[in-house]
């Protein structure tokens, strides 16, 4: 039997980190994963999948991932249940991650925006390759 889950998607919000009474770090986050097909309106839908990660990897997720970060998760699907305050049985299905891969540098969205602004400034500044008719007489040929 095989229970293996591999996902690539973006975090819907910043990861949460807490500790068990025994001091084990537990990280949780939700990954938005696009479906491979489009709906009747031609739009691509996404699934929102809860992920749990433990120990040092939970700390790393908290420190290096944030809302919108692209991440890869390798783990297993697990269903747990508990009784809520109204006495009803609640079932929760989530991915327990064995490995979380950071698929882009931290603050990549901000960095891309800065690169775009720098590119625009360069385009509007002095361009040494601009065809300027004033300097054509200085050419040696």
Curated annotation (Swiss-Prot):
Quaternary structure and partners: Homotetramer.
UniProt protein name: Single-stranded DNA-binding protein 2
Domain SSB stretches: 1-104
Biological process annotations from GO: DNA replication
Low complexity bias (residue ranges): 107-127
Key words of the record: DNA-binding
GO molecular function: single-stranded DNA binding
A Pfam family it matches: SSB
Family annotation (PROSITE patterns): SSB
Highest taxon in the source lineage: Bacteria
